[in-house]
Amino acid sequence: MGEKKPEPLDFVKDFQEYLTQQTHHVNMISGSVSGDKEAEALQGAGTDGDQNGLDHPSVEVSLDENSGMLVDGFERTFDGKLKCRYCNYASKGTARLIEHIRIHTGEKPHRCHLCPFASAYERHLEAHMRSHTGEKPYKCELCSFRCSDRSNLSHHRRRKHKMVPIKGTRSSLSSKKMWGVLQKKTSNLGYSRRALINLSPPSMVVQKPDYLNDFTHEIPNIQTDSYESMAKTTPTGGLPRDPQELMVDNPLNQLSTLAGQLSSLPPENQNPASPDVVPCPDEKPFMIQQPSTQAVVSAVSASIPQSSSPTSPEPRPSHSQRNYSPVAGPSSEPSAHTSTPSIGNSQPSTPAPALPVQDPQLLHHCQHCDMYFFADNILYTIHMGCHGYENPFQCNICGCKCKNKYDFACHFARGQHNQH
């Protein structure tokens, strides 16, 4: 009977040696050096405890309750993580916990052999070595910017591209994909034209243009319910209820719907004697009544005064023209001072009779296509939204680069917008 009492103690000792071997094997794989020393010290302490016969009941309790001291010298929490002895930090791996403890001890074993730099984390040393080698593995997907640290890339996205992380309910469409599509759709909009999407941090707000309020009383039966639904946000700005709704109701789709509604309206005939307006049936919402090459030339020649005809005076800017500049580009001037251009040599200028100030043929002019047939500001804005900002003959819908204004007009007449 006296020989059977030491059996539970021998079982605990054998199990403790087994845990010591397994921990030593894990520390060898992870490259931890301090873990071996602590394991040997704890093994020696466990051997002394076996000789005294005092620590065995506590070991049995720690095995049953999943808490207490392990062979590597760290306390384990109830969820199985290793707890820091200095604070409440807990980690599943020994190597990560040892790196955390170096914050408390101030140890920096990872040193650069080219300069006095030292760090407690190996990944920080790897990022530092890129400053000596010149390696830049992180590249921005929106521009040619490259950097050696991931944090610098995140700072570049926030500062340069106004990209901020979207915090809210998770949806089927990832935030990165949504931002990428929005940046591709709106990156070519000019600064002189009012953008429909405000990409400034901290929120992304889809705004309703102010000029719709000025022109809706002139054009009947215009449905702006889509803009009203997109403009229902807080005064300080807020995110839409669902990113999927933002992708469906993006500004290009809204312009396409608006163009389809405008095409069904009868044309306004403010100046019956002016042959500038070329009626053209369109089958697609985004064709925007693009005329042929001869029609464009005839429209330009009809709007240019002859040598015997007087030139038109400069119109005064209206309320909507002061707040909105329809001519885009770095060399553009305000629309209030935009007069009818002349081709070739200078035409003789003589006093002319006063024309109506609100004549749309004088207020809306595309300098890239040399077209004057825009009846109102809405059609002009839709047309200018089709031009790219950096390259005016690049399609803002599909990114297709055209050679000149005739190729650009034919591209929209065909209506083949294949996303690249």
Swiss-Prot record:
Keywords: DNA-binding, Isopeptide bond, Metal-binding, Nucleus, Repeat, Repressor, Transcription, Transcription regulation, Ubl conjugation, Zinc, Zinc-finger. There is a cross-link at residues 5, 185 (Glycyl lysine isopeptide (Lys-Gly) (interchain with G-Cter in SUMO2)). Residues 223-236, 262-273, 332-349 have a biased composition (Polar residues). One of its GO terms (cellular component) is nucleus. A zinc finger (C2H2-type) spans 82-104, 110-132, 138-161, 364-387, 393-417. It is found in: Nucleus. InterPro entries: Ikaros_C2H2-ZF, Znf_C2H2_sf, Znf_C2H2_type. Residues 290-311 have a biased composition (Low complexity). One of its GO terms (molecular function) is zinc ion binding. Transcriptional repressor that binds the core 5'GNNTGTNG-3' DNA consensus sequence. Involved in megakaryocyte differentiation. The N-terminal zinc fingers are involved in sequence-specific DNA binding and heterotypic associations with other family members. Self-associates. Interacts with other family members; IKZF1, IKZF2, IKZF3 and IKZF4. This is Zinc finger protein Pegasus. It comes from Pongo abelii (Sumatran orangutan). The lineage of its organism: Eukaryota, Metazoa, Chordata, Craniata, Vertebrata. The gene is IKZF5.
